[in-house]
């Protein structure tokens, strides 16, 4: 969806909420939150993530009725359709574009594509999905390997590993669990050891908790 967050019609959103939720105080508070942004939904507000998904809820139901769409996946405003017939997928794409414009007052991005998975993988949510295996997106994998080399050098030189570095690498390692990555783990993760990274994060968490208790105790005194 083109500029999704900024293009959400707030009055229509409140109208849609009012059909589901009868609590006037909640609706009023939600409207006041929406008013803090010049237009659409504010990126970063926790409630706006939920509201964005709610706004496209009817589209999800509509897609299930389209001929030729066997499966569909949506992550926020990124939508993927799967089907055996190319012409039917093109018709489904046109129907979705019309629905977005007429019912939700949104515009579909012009970079949509229709292609067979036999020819190329699906690049989606940080991964590359092939027919029978999944890999991490190339640029994400390169960042991961650089982080591993950086941490490995620090360990070999007995240097301190920063909390941000450890937590960031743990996040990348977590991504590996969702793709075919046995060789990558053996080559890059095993020489480092996840235990060392977790220990850095755990020690920093304890330090922050202790600092918070000290501030609270000082304020109470």
Predicted features by range, described:
Residues 64-67, 104, 152, 156:
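Secondary-structure transition/hinge residues
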Residues 1-76, 80-96, 115-121:
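Conserved polymerase palm-domain catalytic core
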